[in-house]
Swiss-Prot record:
GO molecular function terms noted in the UniProt entry: dUTP diphosphatase activity; magnesium ion binding
Top-rank taxon, per record: Bacteria
UniProt cross-references to CDD domains, sorted A to Z: trimeric_dUTPase
Protein's job: This enzyme is involved in nucleotide metabolism: it produces dUMP, the immediate precursor of thymidine nucleotides and it decreases the intracellular concentration of dUTP so that uracil cannot be incorporated into DNA.
Name the UniProt record assigns to this protein: Deoxyuridine 5'-triphosphate nucleotidohydrolase
Organism, scientific name: Corynebacterium jeikeium (strain K411)
Gene this chain is encoded by: dut
Length: 155
């Protein structure tokens, strides 16, 4: 199958810091997320969080950002999520990718085995715009929404 790609076609360069772990990959060719694996066995007590290494370092293409999202199956079946979902990986970061996991189950600990899929990485284009200060809200421009914020479109 030939996939049509949009925008930046530069590859995601990955180094496995732990060669025994699988290379991160998509479960299906058209999946947005690339599965990330835990580099160690870990037990997360109810309501607790744990910073878990994935055993990889990456070089994202310039003009992209890596967003680390929870896996929906683990969220549903075990109550596992990511504290700062989505986690943000900047294109110039070269350290090990780590995921701050949290056990949202109020009673049961979550046991994760080394090599288990724990999160998914999405690579998205990002606008690297400059910051320009203006002197008043009026200089930001008028919109239909204006200052209507939280709950303004209904519950």
């Amino acid at each position: 199958m030939t996939l049509k790609r949009n925008g930046n076609d530069a590859p995601l360069r990955i180094v496995r810091l732990d060669k025994e772990l699988p290379l991160p990959r998509r479960a299906h060719p058209t999946d947005a997320g690339i599965d990330l694996y835990t580099a160690q066995d870990v037990t997360i007590a109810p309501g607790c969080r744990e910073l878990v290494g994935t055993g990889i370092a990456i070089a994202l293409p310039v003009g992209t950002v890596g967003l680390v999202h929870p896996r929906s199956g683990l969220a549903l079946k075990k109550g596992l999520s990511i504290v700062n979902a989505p986690g943000t990986i900047d294109a110039d970061y070269r350290g090990e990718i780590k995921v701050c996991l949290i056990n949202l189950d109020p009673e049961e600990p979550i046991e994760l085995a080394r090599g288990e899929r724990i999160a998914q990485l999405l690579v998205q284009e990002v606008s690297l715009c400059d910051v320009e200060e203006v002197n008043s809200v009026e200089e930001l421009g008028v919109t239909v929404r204006g200052e209507s914020g939280y709950g303004s479109t209904g519950v």
